[in-house]
Swiss-Prot record:
<dbReference type="InterPro" id="IPR011332">
    <property type="entry name" value="Ribosomal_zn-bd"/>
</dbReference>
<dbReference type="GO" id="GO:1990904">
    <property type="term" value="C:ribonucleoprotein complex"/>
</dbReference>
<dbReference type="GO" id="GO:0006412">
    <property type="term" value="P:translation"/>
</dbReference>
<keyword id="KW-0687">Ribonucleoprotein</keyword>
<comment type="similarity">
    <text>Belongs to the bacterial ribosomal protein bL33 family.</text>
</comment>
<dbReference type="GO" id="GO:0005737">
    <property type="term" value="C:cytoplasm"/>
</dbReference>
<dbReference type="GO" id="GO:0003735">
    <property type="term" value="F:structural constituent of ribosome"/>
</dbReference>
<protein>
    <recommendedName>
        <fullName>Large ribosomal subunit protein bL33A</fullName>
    </recommendedName>
</protein>
<keyword id="KW-0689">Ribosomal protein</keyword>
<dbReference type="InterPro" id="IPR038584">
    <property type="entry name" value="Ribosomal_bL33_sf"/>
</dbReference>
<dbReference type="Pfam" id="PF00471">
    <property type="entry name" value="Ribosomal_L33"/>
</dbReference>
<dbReference type="InterPro" id="IPR018264">
    <property type="entry name" value="Ribosomal_bL33_CS"/>
</dbReference>
<dbReference type="InterPro" id="IPR001705">
    <property type="entry name" value="Ribosomal_bL33"/>
</dbReference>
<dbReference type="GO" id="GO:0005840">
    <property type="term" value="C:ribosome"/>
</dbReference>
Length: 49
């Protein structure tokens, strides 16, 4: 079953990306490189919810 998760940036506190993941296949927190408008570069966003 896929659940919706929120991706947040620890440096700026942004929570602007929403994605889904399969909890059975990836039980630990997801980390993706996404674009941060505040920093104007790609940084690591981690799973918040």
């Amino acid at each position: 079953m896929r659940n919706n998760i929120i991706l947040g940036n620890n440096e700026t506190g942004e929570r602007i990306y929403l994605t889904s993941k399969n909890k059975r296949n990836t039980p630990d927190r997801l980390q993706l490189k996404k674009y941060s408008p505040k920093l104007r570069k790609r940084v690591v966003f981690t799973e918040v919810k």
